[in-house]
């Protein structure tokens, strides 16, 4: 039995972020829809050919998305919220953009659909909305069109489809409450229709993604898989695909399904290959996810060979990435500035395809010399001086319980802070960043390229900070920020100033829609060689009598939004970062900064997928935050910010952070997230986000007032702050001014109504 290679998906955005640029040009009205569609076609053709040339036997089709693959599935099923529909009921690419962004070049603006994290990754999906009695039909044929494209190019393909049970699991009920699982019978005919169309095109295998099968699902959801797949059986071969965790706990549910193969993630799961082989039906194909799709490290192919070789020849076998390569940068070969030694430790998406081809060839032939050669740099890395720092390891080992305790409890600190800041009721602030204009980006780029000297760069940044302070004072905000003009990304900026990180030139990965991030890579022990944010925070504070917040990204978020080391635990990395940033808090405080925000938007997304594993993670995640913050004096107010979060199941841990103020993203969920804080009787101060910064729509004063009044029904008004959902980096100044002016006006109205 010949072993084949395949990937579960490939990065969409293009090596130079061509998709991002085309999307944003289209949204701005600077290019046509036809030009946008042409960019998509060119990228798909290029990516299929690149994977094929790298040694992939079966190419994924349907992994491309104009915004998000879950949103693509919603359109496929005709699941379009009424507020986003075209008047004639048709569906087009602007429908998709209205759901994801709240507006598009055509159609009326409307509130964007909710966005949240894709399992425990840094990718976001648009949450499907379900209503009682909803109807579904095939309305968006993107998958079929892309299959036709790939077949016309002569490729051997494997279409990719998000499975029906996971799709329903990922959604939310809107309006009258009901069990969304009851919609399964209504969406299955659309899936049957799609599979029939694929069969007509001669497709043999379809990858049907059911990552919900790695979760601790309620029994009713587990029971839904059998009737669902009974309905889908018989038209094509189905590769039931899971990732991000192991499947052994749910294997009894899986092995009775009428599918022809199973993909398992052998990186993040703890499944034993031999046990899987013994328990799976004998005629099933096993797709082994042996190459990590979520990190950038070169694989130890000798180890992978040993892991899978025991079942070679005993059943049909494919080798694959653990998950979609969407989460990896595209091509290491274009990284010309990386140190040669460090570069030899990495593999990006195309190199991972090459790793699969090497592994396939070795497993088919029994010859392992090429694998041994590939793995040589991995052995060298284990002993590199770049990896180990004795001083950091010693400091980490010396941490005591006292290092994570503030001097006094919140009630005492709050009195000291009220006396220091004398803020009005409903204090207004922003989350940190202001619009990253063309001028700001150009300034940073010129400096990075050496076209601008340090003095002129600093003068330029200082001017942008000054303008941000002037804008905020003009708007009447109570607590100001410096605007972060000097920062390209909230994680990358800190990584650039901490030892133990390296950076890529083109290591972009998609976060959502057109937003891409370039995560730093943790290659060794982490320390802070010098203050990072103090100079600019101190300068901003010198420009105003109002308090200016110091802005830090928290240790868990830096960990979650970086590519981590694989030779130490995540806890070790987080606590090393916490110790480095603890020194930054002390330096900010010494420089006269009285309010310091430590953002932890990723705290919840870092949760293990299985609830039984949560406690251990939350214990060290909370401890890392507290180590970072606990050096602050009582009169220094510590803020934290979180977004895309469901809080009700981790409220104990949110409270345990002991931040004086927490700002959260609530506008897209209509303040429903505050239910968790109300039920828990959360004791500290809260800033519920009053408008969605991911949409360019400007909220009215009345809209914001209504949200704040709703918030005050749950949280005492004296503990409420007024702020946007998130940072304003991606917005333009006109909409930012308008939205913040309305926000400040709403706060003033509520003060007067007191």
Curated annotation (Swiss-Prot):
EC?
A: 2.1.1.14
Superkingdom of source: Bacteria
Which cofactor does the UniProt annotation name? Answer: Zn(2+)
Please name the GO terms that the record assigns under molecular function: 5-methyltetrahydropteroyltriglutamate-homocysteine S-methyltransferase activity; zinc ion binding
The residues listed in the UniProt record as binding L-homocysteine, with positions renumbered to this chain, are 431-433, 484, 599
Tell me the residue numbers annotated for binding 5-methyltetrahydropteroyltri-L-glutamate. 17-20, 117, 515-516, 561, 605
Q: Which residues form a coiled coil?
A: none
What CDD domains has UniProt attached to this entry?
CIMS_C_terminal_like, CIMS_N_terminal_like
Q: How is the cofactor bound?
A: Binds 1 zinc ion per subunit.
Q: Where is the active site?
A: 694
Cross-referenced InterPro entries: Cbl-indep_Met_Synth_N, Cobalamin-indep_Met_synthase, Met_Synth_C/arc, UROD/MetE-like_sf
Binding of L-methionine: at which residues?
A: 431-433, 484, 599
Q: Which UniProt keywords apply?
A: Amino-acid biosynthesis, Metal-binding, Methionine biosynthesis, Methyltransferase, Repeat, Transferase, Zinc
**Which Pfam families does UniProt cross-reference here?**
Meth_synt_1, Meth_synt_2
Pathway recorded for this protein: Amino-acid biosynthesis; L-methionine biosynthesis via de novo pathway; L-methionine from L-homocysteine (MetE route): step 1/1
Catalytic activity annotation: 5-methyltetrahydropteroyltri-L-glutamate + L-homocysteine = tetrahydropteroyltri-L-glutamate + L-methionine
> Which residues are recorded as binding Zn(2+)?
641, 643, 665, 726
Question: What family is reported?
Answer: Belongs to the vitamin-B12 independent methionine synthase family.
Summarizing the function annotation, the protein's role is: Catalyzes the transfer of a methyl group from 5-methyltetrahydrofolate to homocysteine resulting in methionine formation.
What's the protein name? Answer: 5-methyltetrahydropteroyltriglutamate--homocysteine methyltransferase
Native organism is: Salmonella typhi
- Give the lineage: Bacteria, Pseudomonadati, Pseudomonadota, Gammaproteobacteria, Enterobacterales
């Amino acid at each position: 039995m010949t072993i084949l290679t395949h990937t579960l998906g490939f990065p969409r955005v293009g090596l130079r972020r061509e998709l991002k640029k085309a999307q944003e040009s289209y949204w701005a009205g600077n290019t046509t829809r036809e030009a946008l569609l042409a960019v998509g076609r060119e990228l798909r053709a290029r990516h299929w050919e690149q994977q094929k040339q790298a040694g992939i036997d079966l190419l994924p089709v349907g992994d491309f998305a104009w915004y998000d693959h879950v949103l693509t599935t919603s359109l496929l099923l005709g699941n379009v919220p009424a507020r986003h529909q075209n008047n004639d009921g048709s569906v087009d690419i602007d429908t998709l953009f209205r759901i994801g962004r709240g507006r598009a070049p055509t159609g009326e603006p409307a509130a964007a659909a909710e966005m949240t994290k894709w399992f425990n990754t840094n990718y976001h999906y648009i949450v499907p909305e379900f209503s009682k009695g909803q109807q579904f039909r095939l309305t968006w044929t993107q998958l079929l069109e892309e299959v036709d494209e790939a077949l016309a190019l002569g490729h051997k393909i494997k279409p990719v489809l998000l499975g029906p049970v996971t799709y329903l699991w990922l959604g939310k009920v809107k309006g009258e409450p009901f069990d969304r699982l009851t919609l399964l019978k209504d969406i299955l005919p659309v899936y049957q229709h799609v599979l029939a169309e694929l069969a007509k095109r001669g497709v043999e295998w379809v990858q049907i993604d059911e990552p919900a099968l790695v979760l601790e699902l309620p029994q009713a959801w587990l029971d839904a898989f059998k009737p669902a797949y009974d309905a889908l059986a018989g038209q094509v071969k189905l590769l039931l695909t899971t990732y991000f965790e192991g499947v052994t706990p749910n294997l009894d549910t899986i092995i009775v399904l009428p599918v022809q193969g199973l993909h398992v993630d052998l990186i993040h799961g703890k499944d034993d290959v031999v046990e899987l082989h013994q328990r799976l039906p004998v005629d099933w194909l096993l797709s082994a996810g042996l190459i990590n799709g979520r990190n950038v490290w070169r694989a130890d192919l000798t180890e992978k060979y040993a892991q899978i070789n025991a079942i070679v020849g005993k059943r049909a076998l494919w080798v694959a990435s653990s998950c979609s390569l969407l989460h990896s940068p595209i091509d290491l070969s274009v990284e010309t500035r990386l140190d040669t030694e460090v570069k030899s430790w990495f593999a990006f998406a195309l190199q991972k395809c090459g790793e699969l081809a090497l592994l396939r060839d070795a497993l088919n032939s029994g010859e392992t010399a090429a694998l041994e050669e590939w793995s040589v740099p991995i052995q060298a890395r284990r002993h590199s001086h770049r990896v180990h720092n004795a001083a950091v390891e010693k400091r980490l080992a010396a941490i005591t319980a006292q290092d994570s305790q503030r001097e006094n409890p919140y009630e005492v600190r709050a009195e000291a802070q009220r006396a220091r800041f004398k803020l009005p009721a409903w204090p207004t602030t922003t989350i940190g960043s202001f619009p990253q204009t063309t001028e700001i980006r150009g300034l940073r780029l010129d400096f990075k390229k050496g076209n601008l000297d340090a003095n002129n760069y600093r003068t330029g940044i200082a001017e942008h900070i000054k303008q941000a302070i002037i804008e905020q004072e003009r708007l009447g905000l109570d607590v100001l920020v410096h605007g972060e003009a000097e920062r390209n990304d909230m994680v990358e900026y800190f990584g650039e100033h901490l030892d133990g990180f390296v950076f890529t030139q083109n290591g972009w990965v998609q976060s959502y829609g057109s937003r891409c991030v370039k995560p730093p890579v943790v290659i060794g022990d982490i320390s802070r060689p010098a203050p990072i944010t103090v100079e600019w925070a101190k300068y901003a504070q010198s420009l105003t009598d109002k308090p200016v917040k110091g802005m830090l990204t928290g240790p868990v978020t830096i960990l979650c939004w970086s590519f981590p080391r694989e030779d130490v635990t995540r806890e070790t990395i987080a606590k090393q970062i916490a110790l480095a940033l603890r020194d930054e808090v002390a330096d900010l405080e010494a420089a006269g900064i009285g309010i310091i925000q430590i953002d932890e938007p990723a705290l919840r997304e870092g949760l293990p997928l299985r609830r039984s594993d949560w406690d251990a993670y939350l214990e060290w995640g909370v401890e890392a935050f507290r180590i970072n913050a606990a050096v602050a004096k009582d009169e220094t107010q510590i803020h934290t910010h979180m977004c895309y979060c469901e809080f009700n199941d981790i409220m104990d841990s949110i409270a345990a952070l002991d931040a004086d103020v927490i700002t959260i993203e609530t506008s897209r969920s209509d303040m429903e997230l505050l239910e968790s804080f109300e039920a828990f009787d959360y004791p500290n101060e809260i800033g519920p986000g009053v408008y969605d910064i991911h949409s360019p729509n400007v909220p009215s004063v009345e809209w914001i007032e209504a949200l704040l009044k709703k918030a005050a029904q749950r949280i005492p008004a004296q503990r409420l702050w007024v702020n946007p959902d998130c940072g304003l980096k991606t917005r333009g100044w006109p909409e930012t001014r308008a939205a913040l002016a309305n926000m400040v006006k709403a706060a003033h109205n509520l003060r007067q109504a007191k």
